[in-house]
UniProtKB/Swiss-Prot annotation:
This is Small ribosomal subunit protein uS10. Coiled coil: none annotated. The gene is rpsJ. Involved in the binding of tRNA to the ribosomes. SMART domains: Ribosomal_S10 (SM01403). GO terms for molecular function: structural constituent of ribosome; tRNA binding. It comes from Streptococcus pneumoniae serotype 4 (strain ATCC BAA-334 / TIGR4). Transmembrane segments: none annotated.
Length: 102
């Protein structure tokens, strides 16, 4: 796997769990001897939902809810077979979406 790159994108609603997952990935990759670039914070996606508080009238009374999706990017340069095995066995917290591109 020489001169290859693994790109890992992490997404989560809570930034603390996202940072702990990123720290686990970086620690396991550096322990096996691979070069790591990141975690790079990507722009936070913000979804805003506006609803009417009352059921039938009072349109001026509204409530807003937002959902933030935090994202991080980690590049692992020159991974070894040990690195890939360590990443496959890694136990990440729930609520973190992981996308891996080789």
């Amino acid at each position: 796997m020489a001169n290859k790159k693994i790109r890992i994108r992490l997404k989560a609603y809570e930034h603390r769990t996202l940072d702990t997952a990123a720290a686990k990935i970086v620690e396991s990759a550096t322990r096996t001897g691979a070069q790591v670039a990141g975690p790079i914070p990507l722009p936070t996606e913000r979804s805003l939902y506006t609803i009417i508080r009352a059921t039938h009238k009072y349109k001026d009374s509204r409530e807003q809810f937002e959902m933030r999706t935090h994202k991080r990017l980690i590049d692992i340069v020159n991974p070894t077979q040990k690195t890939v095995d360590a990443l496959m066995k890694l136990d990440l917290p729930s609520g973190v979406n992981v996308e891996i591109k080789l």
